[in-house]
């Protein structure tokens, strides 16, 4: 018996492995896997249902059909195991060997493997350096290929048609060797000398100069080297033996009625075997060449179909006209092996049901129906029943449970106590979509859910369903309790704010409770404390809203963390005093002494968590909920039609608007305004009228007039139910109330244009048929949009998770000094995001100094928590350099200091945290809230876009950065630099506003001057770009010849004449090469130099420039010499919402990107070509100039002779992230992507921490291109993993050699996922065939570093609680110990969990 157990145990243990290698299989290898050759296409005998011998299901090859029983029945039972029956030849063993034993087919003629032939780029084609078409013609027997030229004039690999071959045969006889079919290709591959070829190509690479040739050569060298290094032989890409999949993986199941259901693979295999056998017979008979050839072609096609059906030609179809599923189809796509079975599996011990509210539950509980619990916990109940001796056997226990005896329910109670269950609601968009709860048994059939976790699940009770899972092992229960319990997930991992926040009823209840009311019952009383307040309210002697004085005892934490009591009399209301009873000790009374809206409640919970920690917060949240529900019920707030008060003014506002519209209509008919202007004006009028109506309505709802105690009238905030719901943030918004009681306003047509007659009615008045019809479009579009949005958002999340899945925190501190400069986000006149929000929870990269001094305010490597941020604000610091994931130097993963605070826990992040996945979920989860549309700018919006001045909002002093300016004749500053920024600094030195100032703007105030709020500080003409002189003197025209380069135009209205420079297209032949310019000379006619340089002041004029000066006029610096009209860019669509985020992460180039200067230097224009001009930048140090062709229609921001810095904008447009990376570096591109993504989310009011976006950017910057290989093994121009280059360079520099130089690459997230080092991860993402083909040829090893690879091969992931296991494995391997038995005991699990949890508190000491 013992050895039997040993035998069974030995069967279950799997090998431990560190990596997975994929390579080409040699024919011998295939034969070594095989247990026999499949010779017949038969499958099962349809009468006996026994497999046919030598067929596709043969028991002799693949193993017995029944456990421990041979086919003929001679040997049965376990005692014969291992015997091979002499009659039927079947080995007596378990039947599961039919899942692992393979067979093979000896092919009568070699066959090309379609993956290496047709998967682009074709590996066979690249290796032989032959075009794919030629190879195909050879393989499918259309032409011959020369294998050995011999002494003839035929080249090796030359393609010959049938006629050419016959001619050559006549001419040379058997001097040469030419064949067709796969044999020919096989012969060519066999005769290749890879190493010699490699040498030859490297020599060629050094000699050649052409870019395309280099690219092609590098590709071939890489492929050849891969073959040499991996030990793959090229001829193995041609199959001579075909492996046969084990039969249980391609089952054949008899249905009732004598028919069979079968896997498509069986059909495909049968085809191959049939054709192969026919070919063998033809060869034995020495049939005519043409017949054999045809049969060989058919065999090739059959094998192609088996490997990848439909890749070449038409797909082979089955009986029902649908293409058969080949081996390639089995693994790729959503239904393939990777995504269907390896990355997502179905789980046992689970149930699902509808959810309902459980308002009486505690936060860590959920209500579980008894029926469900009984079913889910069955094994536990059986065990307990046996343990108690209530049932003798499992069978008896089963009977008891089925009969539902009374004792079973008692046992169930015991089993369930302290055994958490997991609740999951699909779609699980972030990690809070699965949380653990303690079950409470309930009657009924619906799961009860705690109302506060609804926000995290995004659940409501209109029929949502949820799934329950039972964690079985002790470790699983421990993890569920310690990490996944709902009470441990109070903060959202996306932004670190509480996610357990009351909403709807609870908010309304608390708001109602904390409102005050003039002259309420009991006003003016003085009470001894909250208890008395409650007594008075309960006995009906005082109203909840009465303004009273109450004695309140507050507790405050002192320096030692002790609570100190402080009692005082507070002006407050009865309701607030009652609410104070549930507030935990340690919070100030001011927290509840206000009308509590949703924001205030959220802030209250956040403060509680930061001051008092987790436990009090959880208890407080529960109390808030119970109280809120109770008082919401007491309030009796409900919606009646009379609550929607329509303002009296509405009628007159609308009639005024109608009168204005009629007036504009008259103007249009008399031809004073164009149709477009009329339309825009009408829409503006109605939009304004709508705003006026809604303002009147809100004013009306907001306040009511009441009589106070002294009998005077007094205004107070209204108790209108609808208004209270909106004001508290419980439900609804001003915009929705406007539709109920104001007017519905303007509607859009299906094409997106606005209908100029608005819906003047509201929902209380009701809509007429036309109005109803107009509004149906918007409603329907909303629904269609939502459906599209969900799919797109899900796909974005999938790509993000895929690119970031292997990023894990792997060490505590790498000691990087690099970092990102953080400044507040300021757009125009308002601070969109203050500095504290951006740096909270980050680690400083260098000491932060007190502004204006050398005192250190915050030392380097400090985790900035709330108190530090307060300190920064007090000292008005407006820039802090913080560590960032993008600049972290850790090789694989990142260090904890570069990441900073774990947002969901509030302390520095632990090692082993999967920050990549968290980042992906945080960005993807709000994706469904983003809009899908692109904004068409037209009408009112476009006119506001052309700004012409800067008006500041606050008072303060002006600060100009990177500015060049001159003073004009009237003493004002004129800006002559391109990217000038104007900031407004308040008296504390904080930046309040920030504006871009264009070239040629005239400043009213200089740098450092004080301004008052509302003052205009800069003006410019938005429609023309001036040319400003920087020196004083006399104007001298050069090359300005009337009729050739310029033409005179006279303005009809003013009679002034001006010169217009002709575009080179409009000039005569003689004027083509002339360069019209204005030169500034002094009184003696000598050139005036530009100050600070030795360049004469000469201003070249582009085409269309307008000059309003005459030759020889005197001018002074800062004057306008010429004006260049700016064509406004027309109406450009702005991509917004989800598509914009996807574009940023995919790093797509915009349609017309900004042109940036590649190097620093002086701009000049070279010879023009048709439609393009040549921009030349000459560096000051005299190195090679840089040239670029720019289309004529691009508006340039620079003049000839101007100096530009590398990365400056030469022509406006959206900037391409690749250019930013190349010219301004990693930090600039990070800043760009983070800010752009945040802009989209900020518009929708979604808060996401910058960290998450930086994590994705780090993954987009994973690759680098080698510029110069140095002494390394890399090829020039090769794209390699950035960490590999860093490691290689470190080793080279340690040995005193020259490292490789490289440039960082920015890849889109899809590209980056496919370019990962792990082929398993890439194959399970997209383009499975291509990835696997590439990996096999290169003989890639997958080191199983990421999470996805480990999930696929079925072991613990190297993150979270699995991190310790992997670290332990690494340590053991380094020490050379035997790998430990994989089973982890319960004690180990609890110990490692404790260690993980403590690491967060005190930091673990075992490194």
UniProtKB/Swiss-Prot annotation:
<dbReference type="GO" id="GO:0003677">
    <property type="term" value="F:DNA binding"/>
</dbReference>
<dbReference type="InterPro" id="IPR044893">
    <property type="entry name" value="RNA_pol_Rpb1_clamp_domain"/>
</dbReference>
<comment type="function">
    <text>DNA-dependent RNA polymerase catalyzes the transcription of DNA into RNA using the four ribonucleoside triphosphates as substrates.</text>
</comment>
<dbReference type="GO" id="GO:0000428">
    <property type="term" value="C:DNA-directed RNA polymerase complex"/>
</dbReference>
<dbReference type="InterPro" id="IPR007080">
    <property type="entry name" value="RNA_pol_Rpb1_1"/>
</dbReference>
<keyword id="KW-0862">Zinc</keyword>
<dbReference type="Pfam" id="PF00623">
    <property type="entry name" value="RNA_pol_Rpb1_2"/>
</dbReference>
<dbReference type="InterPro" id="IPR007066">
    <property type="entry name" value="RNA_pol_Rpb1_3"/>
</dbReference>
<feature type="binding site">
    <location>
        <position position="85"/>
    </location>
    <ligand>
        <name>Zn(2+)</name>
    </ligand>
</feature>
<keyword id="KW-0804">Transcription</keyword>
<dbReference type="Pfam" id="PF04998">
    <property type="entry name" value="RNA_pol_Rpb1_5"/>
</dbReference>
<feature type="binding site">
    <location>
        <position position="464"/>
    </location>
    <ligand>
        <name>Mg(2+)</name>
    </ligand>
</feature>
<keyword id="KW-0240">DNA-directed RNA polymerase</keyword>
<feature type="binding site">
    <location>
        <position position="460"/>
    </location>
    <ligand>
        <name>Mg(2+)</name>
    </ligand>
</feature>
<feature type="binding site">
    <location>
        <position position="88"/>
    </location>
    <ligand>
        <name>Zn(2+)</name>
    </ligand>
</feature>
<dbReference type="GO" id="GO:0006351">
    <property type="term" value="P:DNA-templated transcription"/>
</dbReference>
<comment type="subunit">
    <text>The RNAP catalytic core consists of 2 alpha, 1 beta, 1 beta' and 1 omega subunit. When a sigma factor is associated with the core the holoenzyme is formed, which can initiate transcription.</text>
</comment>
<dbReference type="Pfam" id="PF05000">
    <property type="entry name" value="RNA_pol_Rpb1_4"/>
</dbReference>
<dbReference type="InterPro" id="IPR000722">
    <property type="entry name" value="RNA_pol_asu"/>
</dbReference>
<dbReference type="InterPro" id="IPR042102">
    <property type="entry name" value="RNA_pol_Rpb1_3_sf"/>
</dbReference>
<keyword id="KW-0460">Magnesium</keyword>
<dbReference type="Pfam" id="PF04997">
    <property type="entry name" value="RNA_pol_Rpb1_1"/>
</dbReference>
<dbReference type="GO" id="GO:0003899">
    <property type="term" value="F:DNA-directed RNA polymerase activity"/>
</dbReference>
<dbReference type="InterPro" id="IPR038120">
    <property type="entry name" value="Rpb1_funnel_sf"/>
</dbReference>
<dbReference type="GO" id="GO:0000287">
    <property type="term" value="F:magnesium ion binding"/>
</dbReference>
<dbReference type="InterPro" id="IPR007083">
    <property type="entry name" value="RNA_pol_Rpb1_4"/>
</dbReference>
<dbReference type="InterPro" id="IPR006592">
    <property type="entry name" value="RNA_pol_N"/>
</dbReference>
<feature type="binding site">
    <location>
        <position position="462"/>
    </location>
    <ligand>
        <name>Mg(2+)</name>
    </ligand>
</feature>
<keyword id="KW-0548">Nucleotidyltransferase</keyword>
<dbReference type="InterPro" id="IPR045867">
    <property type="entry name" value="DNA-dir_RpoC_beta_prime"/>
</dbReference>
<feature type="modified residue" description="N6-acetyllysine">
    <location>
        <position position="972"/>
    </location>
</feature>
<keyword id="KW-0479">Metal-binding</keyword>
<protein>
    <recommendedName>
        <fullName>DNA-directed RNA polymerase subunit beta'</fullName>
        <ecNumber>2.7.7.6</ecNumber>
    </recommendedName>
</protein>
<dbReference type="InterPro" id="IPR007081">
    <property type="entry name" value="RNA_pol_Rpb1_5"/>
</dbReference>
<dbReference type="GO" id="GO:0008270">
    <property type="term" value="F:zinc ion binding"/>
</dbReference>
<feature type="binding site">
    <location>
        <position position="72"/>
    </location>
    <ligand>
        <name>Zn(2+)</name>
    </ligand>
</feature>
<comment type="similarity">
    <text>Belongs to the RNA polymerase beta' chain family.</text>
</comment>
<feature type="binding site">
    <location>
        <position position="70"/>
    </location>
    <ligand>
        <name>Zn(2+)</name>
    </ligand>
</feature>
<keyword id="KW-0808">Transferase</keyword>
<dbReference type="InterPro" id="IPR012754">
    <property type="entry name" value="DNA-dir_RpoC_beta_prime_bact"/>
</dbReference>
<dbReference type="Pfam" id="PF04983">
    <property type="entry name" value="RNA_pol_Rpb1_3"/>
</dbReference>
<keyword id="KW-0007">Acetylation</keyword>
């Amino acid at each position: 018996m013992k050895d039997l157990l040993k035998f069974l145990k030995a069967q279950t243990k799997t090998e431990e492995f560190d990596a997975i290698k994929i390579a080409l299989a040699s024919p011998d290898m295939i034969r070594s896997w095989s247990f026999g050759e499949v010779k017949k296409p038969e499958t099962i005998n349809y009468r006996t249902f026994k497999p046919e011998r030598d067929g596709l299901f043969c028991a002799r090859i693949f193993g017995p059909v029944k456990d421990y029983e041979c086919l003929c029945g001679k040997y049965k039972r376990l005692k014969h195991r291992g015997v091979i029956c002499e009659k039927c030849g079947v080995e007596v063993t378990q039947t599961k060997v039919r899942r692992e034993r393979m067979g093979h087919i000896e092919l009568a003629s070699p066959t090309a493997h379609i993956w290496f032939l047709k998967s682009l780029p074709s590996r066979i084609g690249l290796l032989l350096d032959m075009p794919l078409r030629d190879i195909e013609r050879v393989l499918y027997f259309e032409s011959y290929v020369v294998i050995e030229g011999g002494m003839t004039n035929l080249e090796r690999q030359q393609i010959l048609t049938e006629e050419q071959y016959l001619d050559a045969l006549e001419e040379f006889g058997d001097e040469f060797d030419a064949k067709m079919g796969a044999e020919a290709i096989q012969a060519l591959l066999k005769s290749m000398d890879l190493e010699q070829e490699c040498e030859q190509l490297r020599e060629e690479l050094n000699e050649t100069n052409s870019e395309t040739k280099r690219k092609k050569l590098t590709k071939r060298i890489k492929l050849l080297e891969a073959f040499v290094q991996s030990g793959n032989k090229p001829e193995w890409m041609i199959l001579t033996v075909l492996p046969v999949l084990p039969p249980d993986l391609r089952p054949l199941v008899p249905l009732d009625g004598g028919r069979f259901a079968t896997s498509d693979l069986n059909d495909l295999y049968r085809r191959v075997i049939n054709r192969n056998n026919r070919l063998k017979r033809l060869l034995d008979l020495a049939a005519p060449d043409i017949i054999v050839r045809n049969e060989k072609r058919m065999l090739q096609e059959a094998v192609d179909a088996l490997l990848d059906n439909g890749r070449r030609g038409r797909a082979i179809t089955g009986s029902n006209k649908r293409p058969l599923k080949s081996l390639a189809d089995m693994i790729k796509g959503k239904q393939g092996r990777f995504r269907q079975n390896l990355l997502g599996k179905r789980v046992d011990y689970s149930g699902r049901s509808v959810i309902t509210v459980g308002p009486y539950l505690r936060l860590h509980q959920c209500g579980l129906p008894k029926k469900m619990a009984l079913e889910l916990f069955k094994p536990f109940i059986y065990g307990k029943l046996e343990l108690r001796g209530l049932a003798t056997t499992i069978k008896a226990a089963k009977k008891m449970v089925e009969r539902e005896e009374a004792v079973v329910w008692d046992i169930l109670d015991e089993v369930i106590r302290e055994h958490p269950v997991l609740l999951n609601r699909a779609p699980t968009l972030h990690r809070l979509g699965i949380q653990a709860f303690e079950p409470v048994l309930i009657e009924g059939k619906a799961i009860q859910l705690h109302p506060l976790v609804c926000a995290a699940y995004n659940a409501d009770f209109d029929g949502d369903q949820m799934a329950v899972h039972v964690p079985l092992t002790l470790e699983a229960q421990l993890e569920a309790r310690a990490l996944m319990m709902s009470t441990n997930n109070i903060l959202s991992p996306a932004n670190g704010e509480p996610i357990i926040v009351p909403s709807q009823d609870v908010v309304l209840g608390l708001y109602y409770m904390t409102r005050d009311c003039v002259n309420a019952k009991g006003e003016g009383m003085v009470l001894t404390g909250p208890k008395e307040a409650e007594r008075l309210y309960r006995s009906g002697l005082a109203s909840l809203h009465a303004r009273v004085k109450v004695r309140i005892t507050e507790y405050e934490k002192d320096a030692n963390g002790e609570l100190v009591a402080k009692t005082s009399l507070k002006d407050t209301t009865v309701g607030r005093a009652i609410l104070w009873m549930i507030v935990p000790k340690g919070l100030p009374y001011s927290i509840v002494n206000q009308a509590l809206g949703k924001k205030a409640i959220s802030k209250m919970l956040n403060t509680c968590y930061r001051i008092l920690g987790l436990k009090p917060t959880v208890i407080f949240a529960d109390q808030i909920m119970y109280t809120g529900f109770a008082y919401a019920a007491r309030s009796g707030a409900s919606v009646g039609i009379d609550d929607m008060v329509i303002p009296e003014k509405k009628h007159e506002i609308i009639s005024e608007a109608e009168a204005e519209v009629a007036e504009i209509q008259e103007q249009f008919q008399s031809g004073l305004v164009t149709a477009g202007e009329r339309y825009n004006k009408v829409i503006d009028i109605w939009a304004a009228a709508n705003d006026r109506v809604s303002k009147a309505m809100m004013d009306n709802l907001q306040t009511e007039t009441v009589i106070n105690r002294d009998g005077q009238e007094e205004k107070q905030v209204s108790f209108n139910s609808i208004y209270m719901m909106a004001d508290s943030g419980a439900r609804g918004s001003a915009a929705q109330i406007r539709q109920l009681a104001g007017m519905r306003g303007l509607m859009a047509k299906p094409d997106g244009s606005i209908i100029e007659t608005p819906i003047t009615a509201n929902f209380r008045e009701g809509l007429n048929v036309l109005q109803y019809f107009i509004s149906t479009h918007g409603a329907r579009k909303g629904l269609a949009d939502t459906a599209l949005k969900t799919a797109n958002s899900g796909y974005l999340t999938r790509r993000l998770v895929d690119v970031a899945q292997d990023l894990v925190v792997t060490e505590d501190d790498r000691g990087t000094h690099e970092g990102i400069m953080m400044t507040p986000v300021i757009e125009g006149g308002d601070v969109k995001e203050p500095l504290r929000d951006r740096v909270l929870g980050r680690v400083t990269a260098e000491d932060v100094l007190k502004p204006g001094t050398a005192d250190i305010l915050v030392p380097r490597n400090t985790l900035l928590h709330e108190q530090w941020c307060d300190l920064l604000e007090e000292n008005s610091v407006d820039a802090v350099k913080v560590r960032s994931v993008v600049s972290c130097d850790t090789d694989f993963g990142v260090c904890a200091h570069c990441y900073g605070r774990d947002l969901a826990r509030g302390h520095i992040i632990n090692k082993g945290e999967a920050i990549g996945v968290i980042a992906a979920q945080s960005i993807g989860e709000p994706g469904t809230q983003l809009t899908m549309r692109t904004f068409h700018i037209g009408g009112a919006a476009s006119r506001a876009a052309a700004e012409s001045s800067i008006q500041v909002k606050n008072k303060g002093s002006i600060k100009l950065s990177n500015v060049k300016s001159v003073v004009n004749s009237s003493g004002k500053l004129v800006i002559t630099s391109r990217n000038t920024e104007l900031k407004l600094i308040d008296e504390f030195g904080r930046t309040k506003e920030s504006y871009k100032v264009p070239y040629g703007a005239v400043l009213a105030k200089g740098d450092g001057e004080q301004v008052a709020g509302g003052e205009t500080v800069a003006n410019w003409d938005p429609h023309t770009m001036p040319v400003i002189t920087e020196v004083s003197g006399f104007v001298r025209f050069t090359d300005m010849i009337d009729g050739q380069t310029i033409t005179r135009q006279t303005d009809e209205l003013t009679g002034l004449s001006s010169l217009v420079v002709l575009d080179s297209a409009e000039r005569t032949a003689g004027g083509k090469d002339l360069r019209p310019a204005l030169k500034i000379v002094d009184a003696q006619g000598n050139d005036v130099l530009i100050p600070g340089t030795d360049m004469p002041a000469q201003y070249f004029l582009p085409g269309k420039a307008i000059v309003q000066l005459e030759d020889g006029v005197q001018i002074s610096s800062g004057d306008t010499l010429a004006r260049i009209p700016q064509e406004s860019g027309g109406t450009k669509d702005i991509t917004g919402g989800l598509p914009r985020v996807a574009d940023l992460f995919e790093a797509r180039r915009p349609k017309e990107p900004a042109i940036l200067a590649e190097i620093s230097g002086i701009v000049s224009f070279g010879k023009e070509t048709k439609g393009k001009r040549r921009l030349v930048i000459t560096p000051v140090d005299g190195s090679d100039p840089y040239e670029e062709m720019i289309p004529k229609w691009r508006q340039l921001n620079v003049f000839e002779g101007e100096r530009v810095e590398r990365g400056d904008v030469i022509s406006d447009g959206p900037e391409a992230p690749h250019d930013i990376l190349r010219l301004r570096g990693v930090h600039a591109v990070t800043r760009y992507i983070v800010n752009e993504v945040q802009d989209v989310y900020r518009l929708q009011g979604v808060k996401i921490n910058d960290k998450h976006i930086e994590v994705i950017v780090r993954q987009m910057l994973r690759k680098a291109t080698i510029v110069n290989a140095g002494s390394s093994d890399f090829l020039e121009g090769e794209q390699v993993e950035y960490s590999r280059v860093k490691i290689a360079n470190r080793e080279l520099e340690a040995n005193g050699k020259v490292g490789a130089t490289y440039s960082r690459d920015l890849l889109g997230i899809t590209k980056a996922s496919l370019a990962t080092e792990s082929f398993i991860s890439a194959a399970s993402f997209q383009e499975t065939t291509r990835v696997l083909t590439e990996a096999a040829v290169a003989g890639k090893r997958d080191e199983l570093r990421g999470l996805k690879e480990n999930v696929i091969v079925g072991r613990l992931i190297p993150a979270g609680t699995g991190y310790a296991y992997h670290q332990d494995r690494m340590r053991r391997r380094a020490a050379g110990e035997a790998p430990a038995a994989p089973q982890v005991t319960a004690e180990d699990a609890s110990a490692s969990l404790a260690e993980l949890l403590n690491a967060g508190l005190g930091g673990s000491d075992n490194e």
